[in-house]
Amino acid sequence: MLLFLADLLAHFQSAFNVFNYLTLRVILGTLTALMLCLWLGPQVIRRLVERQIGQAVRDDGPQSHLSKAGTPTMGGAMILIAIAVSTLLWGDLTNHYVWLVLAVTLGFGAIGWVDDYRKVVEKNPRGLPARWKYFWQSAIGLGAAVTLYLTAASPVEVSLIVPLFKDVVVPLGLFYIVLTYFVIVGSSNAVNLTDGLDGLAIMPTVLVAMGLAIFAYASGNTVFAQYLHIPLVPGAGELAVFCGTIAGAGLGFLWFNTYPAQVFMGDVGALALGAALGVVAVIVRQEIVLFIMGGVFVMETVSVMLQVGSYKLTGRRIFRMAPLHHHFELKGWPEPRVIVRFWIITVVLVLLGLATLKIR
């Protein structure tokens, strides 16, 4: 929006051309989202408290979590508002990728909002029934996958790129739609599973978004893409602005979500942020890198799958409790220790993911 206005004003004052620089708009988008979240936070928390929209806590979980009962939830709404407003302000609204990632993010956010609303407002512990949750997730995920498949400008945009190898490009054909669906839906649910401790999910999300911003910037730049031997995806550079708004909004939310949390993001935030990371990774053709950088999300998801599978097959549990962060809590780790160590792991994994840009 502001880019369009700047282009008009540039006819009268050339200084406005500075807003055509992508790096500047990434920075401004990040700062705008950060400030919006910091401004919205107290107001959102106050309204959630007034309406008694508080987190319910399971009796069979770690005893330390009982004190969290009643903490305002659904705070992810402020993250989505900050992301949407900042992206619309600083992004190039003629770029179809911008509209696609916003649609996917807000669509998954709507699913999470309905789930949260039924749980905390209507006092229905099941929330949105699983079959309907996965139906709508699948509808949005497949819709995005088909759209990307039909609008691909070159074969490489629907191929699997293998990191560390310059020339390993695997044509996917229609399987691209299946892979894209699983990346978006899987990433969404993985972040949701990780969102169980104060600040545990949001900081890794911020870090991964920052990593993807670098990939998006490079993928949309002809010189960088050729030099780094990564796919050139025309228009993907604008996703760096979107990723910047995720990082900014996430840091703003962390101001209130850090231990001890004043607010939780709820499914409205977790499902949306996970889907956002997934769809960006798909567009810039870095699904495998997302798997690396989002290793904490992967560990949490795999721990649940192993726990459920082991219990059904043998009647025994592998972990004291799943997802994995609860296992460490029940081993006696204080909550802040679990959180910060998972953050440290994510920093290392994001750096490893970025290293694949050069090691080829």
Curated annotation (Swiss-Prot):
Membrane topology designation: Multi-pass membrane protein
PROSITE patterns hit by this protein: MRAY_1, MRAY_2
InterPro entries with a match to the protein in the record: Glycosyl_transferase_4, PNAcMuramoyl-5peptid_Trfase, PNAcMuramoyl-5peptid_Trfase_CS
Catalytically driven reaction(s): UDP-N-acetyl-alpha-D-muramoyl-L-alanyl-gamma-D-glutamyl-meso-2,6-diaminopimeloyl-D-alanyl-D-alanine + di-trans,octa-cis-undecaprenyl phosphate = di-trans,octa-cis-undecaprenyl diphospho-N-acetyl-alpha-D-muramoyl-L-alanyl-D-glutamyl-meso-2,6-diaminopimeloyl-D-alanyl-D-alanine + UMP
Name of this chain's protein: Phospho-N-acetylmuramoyl-pentapeptide-transferase
Catalytic activity, EC: 2.7.8.13
GO cellular component: plasma membrane
Subcellular location: Cell inner membrane
Role this protein plays: Catalyzes the initial step of the lipid cycle reactions in the biosynthesis of the cell wall peptidoglycan: transfers peptidoglycan precursor phospho-MurNAc-pentapeptide from UDP-MurNAc-pentapeptide onto the lipid carrier undecaprenyl phosphate, yielding undecaprenyl-pyrophosphoryl-MurNAc-pentapeptide, known as lipid I.
GO molecular function annotations of the record: metal ion binding; phospho-N-acetylmuramoyl-pentapeptide-transferase activity; UDP-N-acetylmuramoyl-L-alanyl-D-glutamyl-meso-2,6-diaminopimelyl-D-alanyl-D-alanine:undecaprenyl-phosphate transferase activity
Gene name linked to the record: mraY
Alphabetized UniProt keyword annotations: Cell cycle, Cell division, Cell inner membrane, Cell membrane, Cell shape, Cell wall biogenesis/degradation, Magnesium, Membrane, Metal-binding, Peptidoglycan synthesis, Transferase, Transmembrane, Transmembrane helix
HAMAP family to which the protein is assigned, alphabetical: MraY (MF_00038)
Lineage start: Bacteria, Pseudomonadati, Pseudomonadota, Gammaproteobacteria, Oceanospirillales
PANTHER family, per the entry: PHOSPHO-N-ACETYLMURAMOYL-PENTAPEPTIDE-TRANSFERASE, PHOSPHO-N-ACETYLMURAMOYL-PENTAPEPTIDE-TRANSFERASE HOMOLOG
Cofactor list: Mg(2+)
